[in-house]
Curated annotation (Swiss-Prot):
GO terms for biological process: adaptive immune response; antigen processing and presentation; antigen processing and presentation of exogenous peptide antigen via MHC class II; antigen processing and presentation of peptide antigen; immune response. Residues 1-27 form the signal peptide. It is a single-pass type I membrane protein. Glycans are attached at N46. This is H-2 class II histocompatibility antigen, A-Q beta chain. The keyword Isomerase does not apply. Belongs to the MHC class II family.
């Protein structure tokens, strides 16, 4: 499927090239440089559910006229663009063709590109929970759910406390673009943790067959210390058990060396 280019942009490009290639005035000693940009832009929301087409006409880095499909007609951005906007708006054929570019150009190109390129790319998010301040229970705090490295941008992140969705005190950053086309976002929950409460960050994304849920449990410092001590004790126990088995195994084999001299006679 070939990509389409807005027809009026193409026509305008030919005119600009003719003007820029005109011979210089005889006797002129210095070159004059002109830059004309003709930009056709397509904006998509939820795939092709909503499409916006924008054509921009720029001369020496200054936009002079624009067509926006949400407006439905050409609008002059500067006085330089007023004659062109008025003329193009007076031509039903031009106006109808440009309005149709939402489908003939934007939708057409989206469907072609989606079939063959990274628009079908899916990257699963990584999810982690952190506490903004290390404080005791029953003090105001903020839980941060970090959702990173996902594609496409569409994502839904929710907070739950003991199985009930939290809507008060929830805020988030804007989507942050990574250099590899993936995204990340932080979703915060203002809360006051109490002993035994379970907070869950619930993430839904097109790349996932089922949502990702990550839990954070409210614990006192003493409970956390006991848990860490228990884990440390288990690790040390496994190490000493392994060391003891190794020593016992070596001692059962006995020392290696030449047989007693009497056995050789």
């Amino acid at each position: 499927m070939a990509l389409q280019i807005p027809s009026l942009l193409l026509s305008a490009a030919v005119v600009v090239l003719m003007v820029l290639s005109s011979p210089r005035t005889e006797g002129g000693n210095s070159e004059r440089h002109f830059v004309a940009q003709l930009k056709g832009e397509c904006y998509f929301t939820n795939g092709t559910q909503r499409i916006r087409s924008v054509n921009r006409y720029i001369y020496n880095r200054e936009e002079w006229v624009r067509f926006d499909s949400d407006v439905g007609e050409y609008r002059a951005v500067t006085e330089l663009g007023r004659p062109d906007a008025e003329y193009w708006n007076s031509q039903p054929e031009i106006l109808e063709r440009t309005r149709a570019e939402v489908d003939t150009v934007c939708r057409h190109n989206y469907e072609g590109v989606e079939t063959h390129t990274s628009l079908r790319r899916l990257e699963q998010p990584n999810v982690a929970i952190s506490l903004s301040r290390t404080e005791a229970l029953n003090h105001h705090n903020t839980l941060v759910c970090s959702v990173t490295d996902f594609y496409p941008a569409k994502i839904k992140v929710r907070w739950f406390r003991n199985g009930q969705e939290e809507t008060v005190g929830v805020s988030s950053t804007q989507l942050i673009r990574n250099g590899d086309w993936t995204f990340q976002v932080l979703v915060m929950l203002e809360m006051t943790p109490h002993q035994g409460e379970v907070y869950t960050c619930h993430v839904e994304h097109p790349s996932l067959k089922s949502p990702i849920t990550v839990e954070w449990r409210a614990q006192s410092e003493s409970a956390r210390s006991k848990m860490l001590s228990g884990i440390g004790g288990c690790v040390l126990g496994v190490i000493f058990l392994g060391l003891g088995l190794f020593i016992r195994h070596r001692s059962q084999k006995g020392p290696r060396g030449p047989p007693p001299a009497g056995l050789l006679q």
